[in-house]
Amino acid sequence: MQNTAKKATLPATALAALGVVFGDIGTSPLYALKESFHAAHGLGIQPENVLGILSIIFWCLMLIISIKYVAIVMRADNNGEGGIMALLALNLRKAKIADNKKIYMIAIGFIGASLFFGDGIITPAISVLSAVEGLSIATDVFDPFIMPIAIAIIVTLFLVQKHGTAFVGKFFGPITLVWFLSLGILGIHSVIQTPVVLGMFSPHWAIQFIYHHPIMTFFVMGAVVLTVTGGEALYADMGHFGPVPIRLAWFFVVLPCLVLNYAGQGALLLRDPAAIENPFYLLVPQWALYPMIIMATMATVIASQAVISGVFSLARQAIQLGYLPRLSIKHTSESEEGQIYVPFLNWLLLIAIIILILIFKTSSNLASAYGLAVTLTMLCDTILVAVFIYSAWKWSLPKVLLLIIPFFILESVLVGATSLKILSGGWVPLLIGAIAVTILMTWKRGRELTFAKLEHDTLSLDLFVKSIGNSVHWVPGDAVFMTGTPNVVPHAMLHNIKHNKVLHQRNILVTVVIEDVPFVAPEERITTETLAEHFFRIKIFYGFKDEMNVPKALMQAYEQLGLEYDLMHISFFISRDRIVHSVGDGMSPWREKLFISMQRNTSPVSDFYQIPTNRVVELGSQIEI
């Protein structure tokens, strides 16, 4: 776990968590209840329907967020880290599953991660649009400008990503706290006028609604799920803040304020059914409308920022675990390691969000696209947590099923309900998810084939070291060969002998190994091995959230080997592999073409491992897969 939670006091850390963890779920009141009474449902705004839907919302928040995520899922941490990639890595390490069966668990993890990438596109679009749409409540004059204003805010948000959010991020927590308190105050003011709405806390209203409207309930659940969007963030951001501050913020600020606001909107509908046009903004007094629109816009920008940062972080984890090709990653803060910027993803997200806004035009239309991504991600989490509880906690299978099946059934119903909206927008997360899963699976399989080919076709390192003798000319200096296959001779070394007819006095084979843990302790970073007089093998171990700096790690390795370290006398030899198609078993031709394209466009190894470019010698090689 990072040190944020350790250094700051508990209330301060809980305040910081508000701005990062709860931005997404905190903006749901802008549109969730309105969508539950969408005209397409044909549901009348009678008191029993209002109380029934409010009761379903309350119990979904309690069951999915308070019990599933806060009480159960957040205990399934990978050395303090959460998130679907961390959970997948943990299960791959702990679960006693045959290798040929692990592919199913990897597929579930990849689906969940891919849908989160889709969430990174949909969340900024729907949240910013819903905030700006408040202007149309004030006056019709703004109607033609809703989309341009939303797009302008989104573009500005993405333009500042390269500068980082270290400074403005300090204000995210306080602003979000004011936002939640505003939600609560608005709700209380309305509930006092119509206290009968407090009946929503009784589950009998939810049961009665389901009994009288079984088919309608299925449609309504597709909108109710919008109230729990962002639940995964509680788990994903656990490594940064720690579980206790997140739980504290949820139970003492977020949950009460959300419930009060939904109750307040419901009370307004009981008094004035016509308020369904926009129950959130119509809850606001006329004098406070513009300040609330500004506050809502800030809250949605903060929520969007949290999701964007989450996408960047997830991408880095996937890259370091070997599930994505290397991308250029920039660090935007000298003090906070987790603050990163991925240029390629930044512009890809921006373009996708603008296209989404132009296609769907309103937050109401986008709601159809949103729910399916959320429910499928939650279902993936549930399955992976079940595996974790069974394998790591050693619970019996009946006990695991007794705990998990209620959540599995509820979330399966939510998936089914949101699936009804595939044609009206649900296709968006499915398309994004399918593309992302294809990329993840293709890259993983392609790398496996590449390494297998290298292991099979290349000379054994031990045999090479024993046979080299004095048959080559030795030149002064150190040659570091970066290799992913430490037991065979690197292509770069063979090409160096072939073209230059020399070897250096010290030849050091360096392999970077990514462990299934977020961070590796400094004392466990390095293993060294002396193979012969001129040959050494070094393995550098990193966690999937560690910052990788090979020259810095080499300094530690040299010290272990008793060698003098001088970066200016070290040449880094890197093989630039050119992958080509070959006849035989492997991947289908279209996947091979996709893999080859990704391989050609990866970020340079020297940039990724922070190796000075003036110390790099790159030699090309061809590999058939």
Curated annotation (Swiss-Prot):
One GO CC annotation: plasma membrane
InterPro entries (alphabetical): K+_transporter, K_trans_C, K_trans_N, Kup
Membrane topology: Multi-pass membrane protein
Transmembrane residue ranges: 13-33, 53-73, 103-123, 141-161, 172-192, 206-226, 250-270, 282-302, 340-360, 369-389, 400-420, 422-442
Entry's localization field: Cell inner membrane
Catalytic reaction(s) noted: K(+)(in) + H(+)(in) = K(+)(out) + H(+)(out)
MF terms (GO), sorted A to Z: potassium ion transmembrane transporter activity; symporter activity
Presence of keyword Kinase: no
Main localization category: membrane
The entry's keywords: Cell inner membrane, Cell membrane, Ion transport, Membrane, Potassium, Potassium transport, Symport, Transmembrane, Transmembrane helix, Transport
Pfam family, one: K_trans
Disulfide partners: none
Family as reported in the entry's similarity comment: Belongs to the HAK/KUP transporter (TC 2.A.72) family.
Function summary: Transport of potassium into the cell. Likely operates as a K(+):H(+) symporter.
Protein name, as recorded: Probable potassium transport system protein Kup
Name of the coding gene: kup
